[in-house]
């Protein structure tokens, strides 16, 4: 691992328990109502699947249940240990997104769920994904929508104007920051405009063949009624790409 990637992994090592408590085993409606069902749609029918940044393995287990042979890779021992305890079929390896411990051209599909927005630089990770994919293989990228990640962006409930709206910060420049996502939990986030992801992938032979921008999940809106008017603003983006070179 590079020094910077290692430092990013240390943050996830520290906060692995927080992630497991609040985002797995049915705790998070956005995973239950959107991410896991979209994984069913985009990853069904593949034989060998790699989950990059697998965490404690909930997506890997889901895809394994579809009949795939799944390998999950994560930089956090705490996440890998939890994934192995929870079982469900996949094989788990500790490793970096920028140095995947997987043979070249050995995967029919690769997925990365809410991972690349925490990796800087991310181009080496894309290089590795291209390396391990077989020709005509599929890469499915789940992202926090770039509109949400622009610095200074946020939901505004304007009591003076009587309006609710999304304030968009500087969208075009790349930006790296440490964000407090819960009390005492600070994690690295990298904002990049959508074009950066698409162009970096295209330059390496990964071409977008499908894109999803679902509205916020009903469970999320039910938990946060103050976001009621945000049902037309996506929180998640999914890009399915195909390796053509």
Kindly label every feature range from the protein language model.
Residues 98-109:
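A short acidic, Gly/Pro-enriched loop at the edge of an enzyme's catalytic core
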Residues 1-46, 58-62, 79-82, 86, 138-176:
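Conserved class I S-adenosyl-L-methionine
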Residues 123-138:
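A short glycine-rich, Lys/Arg-flanked "PGG" loop and its adjoining helix->strand segment in the class I
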Residues 109-122:
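A short SAM/SAH-binding and catalytic strip from SAM-dependent methyltransferases
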Residues 50-52, 56-99:
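Class I SAM-dependent methyltransferase SAM/SAH-binding core
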Residues 175, 188-211:
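Short alpha-helix
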Residues 147-151, 157, 181-195:
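Acceptor-substrate binding/catalytic loop of class I
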């Amino acid at each position: 691992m590079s020094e910077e990637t290692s430092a990013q992994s240390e943050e996830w090592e520290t906060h692995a328990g927080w992630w497991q408590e609040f985002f797995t085993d049915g705790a998070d409606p956005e995973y239950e109502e959107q991410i896991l069902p979209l994984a069913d749609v985009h990853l069904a029918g593949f034989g060998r699947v790699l989950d990059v940044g697998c965490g404690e393995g909930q997506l890997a287990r889901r895809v394994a249940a579809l009949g795939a042979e799944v390998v999950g890779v994560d930089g956090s021992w705490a996440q890998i240990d939890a994934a192995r305890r929870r079982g469900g079929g996949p094989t788990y390896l500790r490793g970096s997104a920028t140095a995947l411990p997987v043979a070249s051209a050995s995967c029919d599909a690769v997925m990365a769920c809410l991972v690349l927005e925490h990796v800087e630089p991310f181009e080496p990770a894309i290089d590795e994904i291209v390396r391990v994919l077989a020709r005509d293989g599929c890469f499915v990228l789940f992202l926090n929508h770039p509109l949400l990640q622009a610095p200074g962006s946020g939901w505004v409930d304007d009591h003076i104007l009587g309006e609710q709206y999304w304030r968009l910060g500087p969208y075009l420049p790349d930006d790296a920051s440490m964000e407090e996502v819960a009390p005492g939990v600070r994690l690295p986030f990298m904002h990049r405009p959508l074009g950066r992801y698409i162009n970096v992938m295209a330059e390496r032979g990964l071409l977008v063949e499908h894109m999803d921008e679902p509205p916020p999940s009903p469970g999320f809106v039910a938990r946060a009624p103050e976001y009621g008017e945000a049902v037309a603003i996506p929180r998640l983006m999914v890009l399915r790409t195909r390796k053509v070179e």
